[in-house]
C-alpha cells in the first residue's frame, strides 16, 4: 500500500486520533447535549402533562361552577317563588282582615244607629206621652169648663123658673 501512498503508522495514528476525538466529543459534548435535550424534552413533556392536568381541572372546575350556578339559580327561583307565594298569602290575609274590619265597623255603626234610633224613639214616645197628657188635660179642662158653664147656666135657668 505504499505504492498508493498510504502510511500505515500515520493512518493508525489518525484512526486513533479520530476515535479519541469521537470519544471526547461523545463524552464531553454529545452526551451532555443529548442529556440536556432529554431533560428539556422531559420538562416540556411534564409541562404539557401539567397543562393537560390544569386544563382538565379547569374543565372540571367550570363544570362544577356551572352546576353550582344552575343550582343557585334554581334555589333563587325557588326562594323567589316562595316569597311571592308568601306575599300573595299575606296580601290575601290583609284583604280578608280589612274586609273583617270593615264588616265590624259596619255592624258597629249599624248597632250604634239602631241604639240611637231606639233612644230617639223612646224620647219621642216620652214627648208624645207628655203632649198627649197635656192635650188631654187641656181638652178635659176645656170640656169641664164648658160643662161647668153649661151646668151653671142650666142651674140658673132652673132657678129662674122657680122664681
UniProtKB/Swiss-Prot annotation:
Family annotation (SUPFAM superfamilies): F1F0 ATP synthase subunit B, membrane domain (SSF81573)
Keywords, sorted A to Z: ATP synthesis, Cell membrane, CF(0), Hydrogen ion transport, Ion transport, Membrane, Transmembrane, Transmembrane helix, Transport
Topology class, membrane: Single-pass membrane protein
GO MF, any single term: proton-transporting ATP synthase activity, rotational mechanism
Subcellular localization, as worded in the UniProt entry: Cell membrane
Any single GO CC term annotated in Swiss-Prot or TrEMBL for this entry: proton-transporting ATP synthase complex
One Pfam family matching this protein: ATP-synt_B
Coiled-coil blocks: none
Listed CDD domains: ATP-synt_Fo_b (cd06503)
Transmembrane segments: 9-29
Family: Belongs to the ATPase B chain family.
SUBUNIT field: F-type ATPases have 2 components, F(1) - the catalytic core - and F(0) - the membrane proton channel. F(1) has five subunits: alpha(3), beta(3), gamma(1), delta(1), epsilon(1). F(0) has four main subunits: a(1), b(2) and c(10-14). The alpha and beta chains form an alternating ring which encloses part of the gamma chain. F(1) is attached to F(0) by a central stalk formed by the gamma and epsilon chains, while a peripheral stalk is formed by the delta and b chains.
Function: F(1)F(0) ATP synthase produces ATP from ADP in the presence of a proton or sodium gradient. F-type ATPases consist of two structural domains, F(1) containing the extramembraneous catalytic core and F(0) containing the membrane proton channel, linked together by a central stalk and a peripheral stalk. During catalysis, ATP synthesis in the catalytic domain of F(1) is coupled via a rotary mechanism of the central stalk subunits to proton translocation.
Protein name per its UniProtKB record: ATP synthase subunit b
Organism: Roseiflexus castenholzii (strain DSM 13941 / HLO8)
Gene encoding the protein: atpF
Amino acid at each position: 500500500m505504499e505504492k498508493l501512498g498510504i502510511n500505515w503508522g500515520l493512518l493508525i495514528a489518525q484512526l486513533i486520533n479520530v476515535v479519541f476525538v469521537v470519544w471526547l466529543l461523545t463524552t464531553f459534548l454529545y452526551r451532555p447535549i443529548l442529556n440536556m435535550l432529554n431533560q428539556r424534552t422531559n420538562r416540556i413533556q411534564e409541562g404539557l402533562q401539567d397543562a393537560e392536568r390544569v386544563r382538565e381541572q379547569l374543565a372540571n372546575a367550570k363544570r362544577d361552577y356551572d352546576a353550582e350556578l344552575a343550582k343557585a339559580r334554581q334555589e333563587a327561583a325557588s326562594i323567589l317563588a316562595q316569597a311571592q307565594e308568601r306575599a300573595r298569602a299575606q296580601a290575601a290575609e290583609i284583604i280578608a282582615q280589612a274586609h273583617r274590619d270593615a264588616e265590624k265597623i259596619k255592624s258597629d255603626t249599624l248597632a250604634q244607629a239602631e241604639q240611637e234610633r231606639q233612644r230617639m224613639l223612646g224620647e219621642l214616645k216620652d214627648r208624645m206621652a207628655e203632649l198627649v197628657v197635656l192635650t188631654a188635660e187641656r181638652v178635659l179642662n176645656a170640656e169641664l169648663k164648658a160643662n161647668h158653664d153649661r151646668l151653671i147656666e142650666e142651674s140658673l135657668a132652673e132657678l129662674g123658673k122657680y122664681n
